[in-house]
Regions:
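ATP-dependent adenylation/nucleotidyltransferase module used to activate substrates
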Residues: 1-180, 206
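Immediate flanking context of iron-sulfur cluster ligation sites
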Residues: 177-201
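Iron-sulfur (Fe-S) cluster-binding segments and ferredoxin-like electron-carrier domains
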Residues: 196-232, 236-243
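Short flanking/linker segments adjacent to small metal-binding domains or redox-active Cys/His motifs
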Residues: 244-249
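Short amphipathic alpha-helical surface patches that serve as generic macromolecular interface elements
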Residues: 134, 166, 184-187, 200-203, ...
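Charge-dense, low-complexity polyampholytic segments
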Residues: 109, 114, 187-189, 218-226
Length: 249
């Protein structure tokens, strides 16, 4: 979502893509549409397309897709986080995005950039987040397509951690005249959201998000929940602080 704000700041025309591949955290698709609608209400128009790959759900083996094992809890660096890998996910997303970008570039005869939210916190547990994967994927795209030089990449957070991304979000919200909390409450990081749409605070993705908000010194505007029902940010924060203390001990 911060990347989308950065793209609105840098480009005259922005197209945003989301993917429905049968993920358990499908609430992210609803939040994406809500954010697009909010931005439009503030005069920032984005072409938004949701690409359905839900026919894959019965074919993929991962705790993140419907029918898979339970999503593990804890810190990202724990070995059990390999269960959250979706085979070839980023390759599928990259291929579709490259096809869209090149089609647009050929239609307009203009340079088109693919904006990627790659950041310094991307984890080694995900092989398709590694630099060697991205280099090989880009090479295959350029070998396999005519006029591929018309497509470039915009990676503003390559050397930035999640705290730095949130800090940029604060700057961008001021620049674009939008409210930080109104933006970020329309996001989802949780891999284990509740049926209500509220986020858990124990899965690794949620732990890392809350850790960044703790460092930012600002409450996370999303609603958290556990087996007792909705909980305050302070409850989620205390749980994450305990996880971080145990991990670093």
């Amino acid at each position: 979502s911060t990347l989308l704000l950065r793209a609105l700041s840098e480009y005259d025309s922005v197209t945003a893509l989301s993917f429905d591949y049968g993920q358990k955290h499908r609430v992210e698709l609803q939040r994406a549409q809500s954010l697009i609608d909010y931005l439009a209400s503030k005069g920032h128009n984005v072409t938004y397309k949701q690409i359905k790959l839900d026919g894959l759900v019965d074919l993929l083996n991962s705790s993140l897709v419907q029918g898979g094992d339970d999503v593990p809890e804890g810190h990202y660096e724990q070995d059990n986080m390999k269960e959250t890998v979706v085979p070839n996910r980023n390759k599928m997303f990259a291929s579709i995005t490259q096809a869209v970008a090149l089609s647009k570039a050929n239609a307009t005869q203009e340079q088109v950039d693919i904006c990627l939210g790659i950041h310094a916190g991307d984890h080694a547990v995900y092989p398709d987040c590694r630099q060697e994967f991205r280099d090989a994927d880009d090479a295959a795209f350029r070998i396999g397509n005519w006029e591929a030089e018309r497509v470039g990449y915009f990676t503003p957070y390559l050397d930035t951690d999640k705290l730095g991304i949130l800090q940029d979000g604060l700057v961008l919200c001021d620049e674009l005249n939008i409210d930080f909390d109104d933006v970020y409450k329309r996001t989802n990081t949780s891999y284990k959201p509740y049926p209500s749409g509220n986020s858990d605070y124990k899965s690794a993705s949620s732990v890392e998000r809350i850790e960044a908000f703790i460092a930012l010194g600002r409450p996370d505007p999303v609603q958290y929940e556990d087996e007792t029902g909705p909980v305050s940010y302070e409850v989620a924060k205390a749980s994450v602080e305990k996880v971080l203390a145990e991990y670093s001990a």
